[in-house]
């Protein structure tokens, strides 16, 4: 079942009521209004309003159900997320396998990750009517551990093609459509972290990204092949270029990405579900039950 995504952009209160998530706010007549949501139906929650109160009991329940909770800052951009300590009954077995992974295994997994990312970047360019052959050739040449830094070479060419004649450079604080890319990537990161935790893996122990100040190294690794899905949505719509700050309409569009269909293995499924499939296949790789991480691809047009 596809989990629901909820967006809370108005003042109010979130609390737990009879094992349901309850949202209480006031209407134009200052009368109290309340809505409830079954926790088992939820997969993703965005808390945007700075005047939103959330109870501790509510946060505990959301963490227990492994529901991704993203908190936004004063600029309405994602700034933090709720990370449960445990989300899988086999967590110890999976975590031990992850921590025992050899450098050779991690290098092989990173090669697969970079290859999948570049392949999806090439498909993104093709869908936008841009030249993609160079990236397809580059994807086939990625070495273990990406020792030749094919990821960076691909990124440079990729964003040059996406930008075209416009003076665009990819940076966190840059001009549009950077805000849309930042928002979309942050949503992806939270979704991937949720899936990894749900599979009993440690987000802090990456296969490539390793930084003592980054508790989401593995999420940053595994989300890489998913980035082109955000890119394709952003660069195919001029709405994300028009304004320096994202409005509710643009944010709603980006959140719809989680329900967009992709090809995962041999099946067509929503992106959010495919992230869980990728996470599960990564676990099997750590357990030495499989040798290839299953990343999603674009649905062919």
Question: Where would I find each of the regions flagged by the language model?
Answer:
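N-terminal, Lys/Arg-enriched amphipathic/low-complexity engagement segments
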Residues: 1-35
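Active-site helix-to-loop segments that bind/position phosphate- or nucleotide-bearing substrates
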Residues: 2-5, 11-12, 24, 64, ...
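A broad, structure-centric signal for solvent-exposed, well-ordered loop/edge residues
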Residues: 23, 30, 44-46, 54, ...
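Glycine/small-residue-rich interface belts in oligomeric ring/scaffold proteins
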Residues: 34-90
């Amino acid at each position: 079942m596809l989990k629901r995504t909820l967006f809370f952009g108005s003042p109010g209160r979130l609390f737990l009521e009879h094992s349901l998530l309850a949202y209480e706010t006031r209407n134009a007549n200052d009368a109290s209004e309340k809505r409830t949501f079954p926790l088992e139906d939820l997969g993703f929650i965005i808390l945007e309003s700075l005047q939103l109160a959330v109870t501790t009991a509510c946060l505990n329940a959301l963490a227990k159900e492994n529901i991704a909770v993203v908190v936004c800052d004063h600029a309405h951009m994602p700034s933090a997320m709720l990370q449960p300590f445990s989300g899988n009954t086999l967590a110890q077995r999976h975590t031990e396998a992850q921590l025992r992974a050899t450098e050779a295994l991690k290098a092989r997994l990173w090669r697969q990750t970079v290859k999948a990312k570049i392949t999806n970047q090439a498909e993104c360019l093709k869908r936008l009517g841009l030249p993609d052959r160079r990236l397809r050739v580059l994807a086939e040449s990625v070495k273990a551990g990406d020792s030749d830094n094919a990821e960076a070479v691909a990124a440079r060419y990729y964003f040059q093609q996406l930008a075209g004649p416009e003076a665009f450079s990819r940076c966190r604080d840059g001009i549009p459509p950077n805000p849309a890319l930042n928002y979309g990537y942050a949503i992806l990161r939270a979704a991937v972290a949720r899936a990894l935790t749900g599979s009993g893996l440690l987000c802090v122990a990456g296969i490539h990204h390793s930084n003592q100040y980054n508790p989401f190294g593995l999420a940053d690794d595994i989300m890489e092949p998913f980035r082109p899905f955000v890119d394709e949505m952003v660069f195919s719509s001029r709405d994300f270029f028009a304004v320096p700050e994202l409005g509710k309409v643009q944010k709603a569009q980006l959140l719809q990405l989680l329900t967009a269909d992709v090809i995962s293995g041999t099946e067509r499924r929503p992106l959010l579900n495919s992230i869980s499939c990728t996470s599960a296949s990564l676990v099997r790789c750590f357990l030495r039950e499989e040798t290839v991480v299953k990343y999603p691809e674009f649905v062919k047009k």
